[in-house]
Amino acid sequence: MSKQTFSTTFAGKPLVVEVGQVAKQANGATVVRYGESTVLTAAVMSKKMATGDFFPLQVNYEEKMYAAGKFPGGFMKREGRPSTDATLTARLIDRPIRPMFAEGFRNEIQVINTVLSYDENASAPMAAMFGSSLALSISDIPFNGPIAGVQVGYIDGEFIINPDKAQMEASLLELTVAGSKEAINMVESGAKELSEDIMLEALLKGHQAIQELIAFQEEIVAAVGKEKAEVELLQVDADLQAEIVAKYNADLQKAVQVEEKKAREAATEAVKETVKAEYEAKFAEDENLATIMRDVAEILEQMEHAEVRRLITEDKVRPDGRKVDEIRPLDAQIDFLPKVHGSGLFTRGQTQALSVLTLAPMGDTQIIDGLDDEYKKRFLHHYNFPQYSVGETGRYGAAGRREIGHGALGERALEQVLPSLEEFPYAIRLVAEVLESNGSSSQASICAGTLALMAGGVPIKAPVAGIAMGLISDGTNYTVLTDIQGLEDHFGDMDFKVAGTRDGITALQMDIKIEGITPQILEEALAQAKKARFEILDLIETTIPAPRPELAPTAPKIDTIQIDVDKIKIVIGKGGETIDKIIAETGVKIDIDEEGLVQIFSSDQAAIDRTKEIITSLVREAKVGEVYHAKVVRIEKFGAFVNLFDKTDALVHISEIAWTRTANVSDVLEVGEEVDVKVIKVDDKGRVDASMKALIPRPPKPEKKEEKASEAKEASNDQASKSQSETASEEK
């Protein structure tokens, strides 16, 4: 195929698609140019069905630093493991694509997005999502697309599609929504306490824009799309399925209805093991034993899947006996751990999360150096999911994509209520340890995080709670579930997480296993989630009504000093010598920003006070009118130099020593002598003039002879008048 180009304008920016020029050995490849962002997407499919009981789809989003004209950091100066943002973007693309493959599809699929040039005002992630769908759609890979995605902002009551960087910074909403022409199938959002009505409207506005992008894709597919390949789907033997269902469905139905998770798992596993043992013995000599046993396992999974869904949709009975809108038993506790800066333990049924707060100086913030300009990240929310939380053994190591994604969701939910840097000048880290899990552990970590922040004295604007909503749909009828547990998540059609305060939503995340959901379902799920969120907030506010007024004793205390920008070098010293000495003496941490704001951190208030003393003296300036007790350090013919404080000297000119004439400075002053002086001038170069005589009362001026004679005569006359008056009085 020769190169073909297609172009349109979307959200005020040119959108250009090129096919047929690069990556021609992939099943499908596109170059998408949106604004000045350029993304190459290549989609590849394996020749044969992969082994395993899952669909092996891999989506990568690779940030090349040259795309932004930057050198990679680190010693190797080469791109390494994906950044957190790249990992989250890969998940963002994976989630709407995955439901668009046929049930039973098991061929391995790789979709690789490479950012070749980067424009901060034209979303490269949205270009990559568009390119991923289009590369699959024009290829011979069986894909039930296309899909597309957009970002939605909300400024001054108006919705903005794919806002630029400045608009996103001003926006009350940061929403990514994806879907097909018919329906939405993925949502990811952070919001500044927006109402359910505004969020729903934003989703619908986003879907309208998505339809425009899908129409453009369909035009391209019609022009250059390949015929789809015939691919083997995983299908079980129909006769074998009918036999197992007839013999064991009643037993499995009974096992599924055991309310307690562990007991239910044991009961269902016992039925499955019985069936597997029977058929393994029955077909022990059959050369297709492996295929038969794979079918047996798949049939049992389908039977459990069907029974859980039937119970909910027909009998309105959930596996643990709850109503469809009922939350599991709740419990909340603060101060679970001593010594730490704050901790909260939140339990909902068999899901439990411990959140631990750590406060630190702003110098400990994470520096993010990706395709955007380098910036400091003040708030971190990390999520850990150990295998013991579900009673299993498994891999331990660095956080995987799921843990990174769940941590980011909690971060978005809680970030909206954090105090500003001016109100609370700390770097903040929350770590969520999932101790027990039976569904919706990410939302439990948000609730535990709220408890830890409030217990630690972080003045958040309002407590945040999260809840996960589920859906069981047969295409015609549907049931929305509140607070889904693991089994309902596994066999259900939707995982819709909603977090927020009493005033509004702060985060959304939705993933579905069907091709899309309607606005009616979204509206119902949001309303049901609000009711559940308020119930959880009642518990949180009962546990701790408001953030504590003080930090934990172990938390670092902070004090600040504002110094002139030109004094920063004095505090730091040559090669950091001065500041290092201060830190060595006091044991504090010191941060100085570009504006001259000095932040001092320590758990010891005395150390903070001493540090303030030292820094204040270093940057202190003599001011006109101030009086100092100074020491004479040098004597010259024209005057004496005195030390006012630290490295600040002043000149006392010979004429400023006394009101009477001073013949020789050395006759009056000597080196080492201490005197009081008053600053009378500071020039533009910082040179200080001081005066001793300004602190001495000025003696009266000498009087002239004529004035003295006149004054004497007047005094004599007054005295005579007084004597005459007294004589007259006596005679009377």
Curated annotation (Swiss-Prot):
Residues 556-615 form the KH domain. Residues 691-732 are annotated as: Disordered. One of its GO terms (biological process) is mRNA catabolic process. Its cofactor is Mg(2+). This is Polyribonucleotide nucleotidyltransferase. Residues 625-693 form the S1 motif domain. One of its GO terms (cellular component) is cytosol. It comes from the Bacteria. GO terms for molecular function: 3'-5'-RNA exonuclease activity; magnesium ion binding; polyribonucleotide nucleotidyltransferase activity; RNA binding. PANTHER family: POLYRIBONUCLEOTIDE NUCLEOTIDYLTRANSFERASE (PTHR11252), POLYRIBONUCLEOTIDE NUCLEOTIDYLTRANSFERASE 1, MITOCHONDRIAL (PTHR11252:SF0). The gene is pnp. Residues 700-716 have a biased composition (Basic and acidic residues). PROSITE patterns: KH_TYPE_1 (PS50084), S1 (PS50126). Gene3D superfamilies: GHMP Kinase, N-terminal domain, K Homology domain, type 1, Nucleic acid-binding proteins. Coiled coil: none annotated. Residues 717-732 have a biased composition (Polar residues). Involved in mRNA degradation. Catalyzes the phosphorolysis of single-stranded polyribonucleotides processively in the 3'- to 5'-direction. It catalyses: RNA(n+1) + phosphate = RNA(n) + a ribonucleoside 5'-diphosphate. It is an enzyme of class 2 (transferase). Its EC number is 2.7.7.8. Belongs to the polyribonucleotide nucleotidyltransferase family. Mg(2+) binds at residues 489, 495.
